[in-house]
């Protein structure tokens, strides 16, 4: 495995840990943001391994899935699409109070749980060479 791939994996795990800290402190919008970043970086690890090059500077998770040539199970793909859509409104909310209501603690917990599940699957695929 390439050293830059290993770095992407470490960054993804660091970002998931940061999302967990944001959950504890009640910063739920940042849970979504950091969860998205964790998935983005793990997908970039896949792209790095497949292309043997530094991945494009993209935040689009669906693009990265395609670029990596991954056959993602449908429930994981559905979540990737969902968090991909949530990324911009949680990063740049037009109405902070509305965003805080929409992305409540329970929503943040669900996002972080699903992120951890998808990250685990992505890492397993990387380690197995699939």
Task: Please provide the spans of the model-predicted regions.
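Terminal alpha-helical segments
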Residues: 1-130
